[in-house]
Amino acid sequence: MSVQAPSVPDLRQQVHDAARRARSAARGLATLSTDTKDRALRTAADHVLMNTRAILEANEADLDTARSSGTPEAMLDRLALTPARVEGIADGLRQVAGLPDPVGEVLRGRTLPNGLQLRQQRVPLGVVGIVYEGRPNVTVDAFGLTLKSGNAVLLRGSSSAARSNAALVDALRAALATELLDVDAVQLLPSADRASVTHLIQARGLVDVVIPRGGAGLIDAVVRDAQVPTIETGVGNCHVYVHSSADLDTAESIVLNAKTRRPSVCNAAESLLIDAAVADVAVPRLTDALQAAGVTVHIDPTEDELRAEFLSMDIALAIVDGVDGAISHINEYGTGHTEAIVTTDLAAAQRFTERVDAAAVMVNASTAFTDGEQFGFGAEIGISTQKLHARGPMGLPELTSTKWIVWGDGHTRPA
């Protein structure tokens, strides 16, 4: 009989140990004062800026690896950090520090006829797992929002951003140590082995919720295999519908902004719907404008293209029969993210907003506005495309649950 030499803890054990440390940290975070959390967030912003050089060097190493492996330009843009983007990341932490603290907020309360006093108040979720692709800014956004809402966070980023994420987390943990807080409030899980995702999403009893951020493949895999609660985020086949009453100058401006501002993000428009009543005029005009901006317009889209989240300078074009045709098309092909109508007809706008099934519905505005910062939430943990427990851009309140507090005076319940 052979005897194996002792080995380091396996990956499952590493992930579970990290979750236990996060649980311990979360218990302390749950009762921190708002002032303490805000001070820690401002210190974290300072530490990110102090470490800009190390962060950018780590990011450049990630970019070099990504380029050598043929990563598409849109994905390189998501991965890239610049001095301005690092400054923006730090500013995001300061913005979160300035937001109202949701923890302890009383949602409702009453005194029962028997004298019992009830109140329902917000409490942290506990341990939040984030699984995300090559976007280093998510590392800090997730930390800021989870800390302010009293949660600990386990981060499992993409291996493509491993060096960037490590440099950022080092800065965040140093800030927590400076403020004498538990550094395990934020932990970065190994990204080289995909099994770490499995161990995280199946850590029932150790992790309270997992939020996947990324493409459809990642999100579907997490939701399918998870044994802990999940919140689906981000897959965005967003449509812009140009109604028969639309001002075409307005429509052109909105369509171009929704498609070309940042084509690699989930709130970018992927489909353009044009009302049949104005197709003869609107199709050539909007197609020419999009093509002049470098967009490939799929004029006779396949079924797959109608369902695609391109995340690139591509857009599917379809002709629909009136507002009901647009609603039917969107409810068939949309992903429940963001849908927009361009119209001067109030009745059409109201019908569209009432009947389209999406987390956000825009009237005469670009889909690009579906964003936590644009909505005034500061950074966002993601944009939920499901209906429970949160929907749309997820800010601080969406990272809480509730607890009932009942005060009595020796009350007992009669038989």
UniProtKB/Swiss-Prot annotation:
It is found in: Cytoplasm. GO terms for cellular component: cytoplasm. Pathway: Amino-acid biosynthesis; L-proline biosynthesis; L-glutamate 5-semialdehyde from L-glutamate: step 2/2. GO terms for molecular function: glutamate-5-semialdehyde dehydrogenase activity; NADP binding. Belongs to the gamma-glutamyl phosphate reductase family. It catalyses: L-glutamate 5-semialdehyde + phosphate + NADP(+) = L-glutamyl 5-phosphate + NADPH + H(+). GO terms for biological process: L-proline biosynthetic process. It comes from the Bacteria. This is Gamma-glutamyl phosphate reductase. Keywords: Amino-acid biosynthesis, Cytoplasm, NADP, Oxidoreductase, Proline biosynthesis. Pfam families: Aldedh (PF00171). It comes from Mycolicibacterium gilvum (strain PYR-GCK) (Mycobacterium gilvum (strain PYR-GCK)). Its EC number is 1.2.1.41. InterPro entries: Ald_DH/histidinol_DH, Ald_DH_C, Ald_DH_N, Aldehyde_DH_dom, G-glutamylP_reductase_CS, Glu-5-SA_DH, GPR_dom. Catalyzes the NADPH-dependent reduction of L-glutamate 5-phosphate into L-glutamate 5-semialdehyde and phosphate. The product spontaneously undergoes cyclization to form 1-pyrroline-5-carboxylate.
